[in-house]
UniProtKB/Swiss-Prot annotation:
Annotated GO MF terms: toxin activity
Domain notes from UniProt: The cysteine framework is IX (C-C-C-C-C-C).
Disulphide-bridged cysteine pairs: 9-33, 15-40, 23-42
Native source organism of the sequence: Californiconus californicus (California cone)
Stated name of the protein: Conotoxin Cl9a
């Protein structure tokens, strides 16, 4: 599942996907920041 525009994944205007940054999905589970179709978001 990919949830775009996860604010916690964006630091200083850049998506933190390359550093395997953790993030919280809307379901409450922990995911990892990712980029999909040019959007930064949280993915599990």
């Amino acid at each position: 599942t990919f949830e775009p525009n996860a604010e916690e994944c964006i630091v200083d205007g850049r998506c933190k996907h390359r550093s395997d940054w953790p993030c919280e999905m809307s379901s409450g589970t922990t995911g990892r920041c990712d980029v999909s179709l040019g959007a930064c978001g949280c993915s599990n």
